[in-house]
Amino acid sequence: MPSQVTSDRLLAVLPEDLRPLAAQRLTTAEPVLRRLLAGLYGERADFDAWLGDLMESLGKLYAERPPELRALDIQRAAQPAWFLNQRMLGYCAYVQNFGGSLNGVADRIPYLEELGISYLHLLPFLRPREGENDGGFAVTSFDEVDPALGTNADLHELTTRLRTAGISLCSDFILNHVADDNQWALAAKAGDPKARAMFHVFPDRDMPDRHERTLGQVFPQVAPGNFTYVEAMGGWVWTTFYPYQWDMNWSNPDVFAAMAAAMLRLANRGIEVFRLDSTAFLWKREGTNSMNQPEAHQLLQALRAIVDIVAPGVLLKAEAIVPTRELPAYLGSTAAPECHIAYHSSLMAAGWVALAEQNTGVLREVIRNTPPLPSAATWLSYLRCHDDIG
């Protein structure tokens, strides 16, 4: 049974007509969410108060969800395997290269319909960092469209037209890091202690050097190391990717609450699938490579529980470029669901090897060694993406 106190905090902010269905969802998902979050943050003295505040926030986002999206939630919750249809066909593009703007993409919907597309992944279109921004993967604001590509109103129009055409829009949700000009980073630079605690900041090289002994490097040639000295912070900030991308401190429950809310606000704008970027890096632990830690899976399962409560029509897609044997963990299990979809990166790479060498040996070996998946989860088998073939 759900905790009455936390459930009541969510239900209290809902209109009367939305409460019965919300209460039904809470019966299943709230105990799961509480258990996962207690495992991550339960040792904090303020855990119960924090959890109550989180549930109230979720209730407000539930209430703000547009009626047409709530109807989609009901439809898909009644058919939880809707996305396992063998006719699901995806298309991936940069907005600027496919229509030039969100409005331009909307004008190309008839073309997508001709192709039989049911899933459109548009690479980052939220407001990015000024200057270098890793192709949009250094996000300044989760609540604003990149002005070069359109407006929030344009995004709403696009998602509405896509939904009418039976096409689900997928957006990247970069949850490992934000740009160094994101509002949280700016507040941290200005001396706000709560904002500073949202990042991994070290006063000297002692802890960074200890971590570096076991960490890999993502871009050793152009961005060596995993820590960047930031004068305004008076310390070293964890930057797994580029120096201007600050890793979020997911051991801080305020980060979980802020990122969950940001994701749900985007869901309420009509995003139906989230590509969760760099999921393997979410949790840091000294003495390891800080990848694939158990807590990273707890975080993803908690986000899944939140989606199941507020927006069950939404899918979560794991981007975890790890060995094939480690990938199923990001889909969870029937008893403990995590993401709905995961990239099968090894299959993609093996496909190109087969094409280049005119030999299917590697491809057949990858298929043979691909582990089974939970019943309500699937691979995203893809031909190419914006990253290298690996």
Predicted regions and their residues:
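Active-site-proximal substrate-binding groove within the catalytic cores of carbohydrate-active enzymes
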Residues: 366-390
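An active-site-proximal structural segment forming one wall of the substrate-binding cleft
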Residues: 254-274, 363-367, 371-373
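Generic recognition of flexible, low-complexity loop/linker segments
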Residues: 79-80, 262, 305, 368-370, ...
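Catalytic-core regions of glycoside hydrolase
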Residues: 343, 359-362
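Residue-level signal for helical boundary/lining positions with a hydrophobic bias
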Residues: 168, 273, 381-384
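Acidic/aromatic-lined carbohydrate-recognition and catalytic surfaces
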Residues: 1-251, 256-257, 264, 268, ...
